[in-house]
Amino acid sequence: LVDHVYNTVKENFDVAAWVTVSESYRIGDLLKKIAAQFGIAVDVTNNEMRGLAKSIHNYLQGKKYIMVLDDVWAERLWPEIRNVFSTSNCTSRVVMTSRKQTVLATREFAYRIHLEPLQAHHSWVLFCKGAFWTTDEKKCPLDLQELAWKFIAKCQGLPIATACIGRLLSCKPQNSVEWEDVYRCLDSQFAKDVIPDAHLILKVS
């Protein structure tokens, strides 16, 4: 959803940037990514965070910008980087996405949108669209339906996880032996992470 909105509205801003933060990050590396996305020339060998932050702040001064910080896990992130973003233009926007409500609990965010997980039948349609896009009927065979629902249950209604697993299975032979093998691999990966993550799914592929 955020990706769709971002690509739709970014032309209305002077500059736009999208950076995926993820669970483990370092401020210096994150600032370099932000600078690169905005097209700011910085010395990549320079790890002096104050200098990087000032360069970004000065560049954004007076500009109408949109900045998306995707997949934020740490509550400390916004306090660490809030001063990077110029507030001289009230039409600029900073958007953060997170799977943790506590990350976005600060009153500094004017709007919060909570996305509900997909309903079961919507998950099924999305899964089949990915898993069987190469077939003529684009439907799940009866002998794989029980396993298909097990995969869908693992995704907990998350669209990106459902779509990724569907696409992964589309590259595998469509038989229960192959699918069960993939399921076991995913099960061991998900056991290390309470919430399904696209990066974990890609590891299995």
Can you name each region flagged by the protein language model?
Residues 24-28, 75, 121, 159:
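Loop/helix-junction capping segments adjacent to catalytic residues or to phosphate/diphosphate-binding pockets
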Residues 34-46, 90-92, 100-205:
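Non-catalytic, charged helical/coil tracts that couple and regulate nucleotide-powered enzyme cores
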Residues 1-55:
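Post-nucleotide-binding-loop coupling segment downstream of the phosphate-binding loop, primarily
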Residues 4-12, 50-118:
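A conserved switch/coupling segment of P-loop NTPase cores
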Residues 20-23, 71, 117, 155:
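Short loop or secondary-structure boundary microenvironments that flank
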Residues 18, 73, 78, 124, ...:
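Tryptophan-centered motif/residue detector
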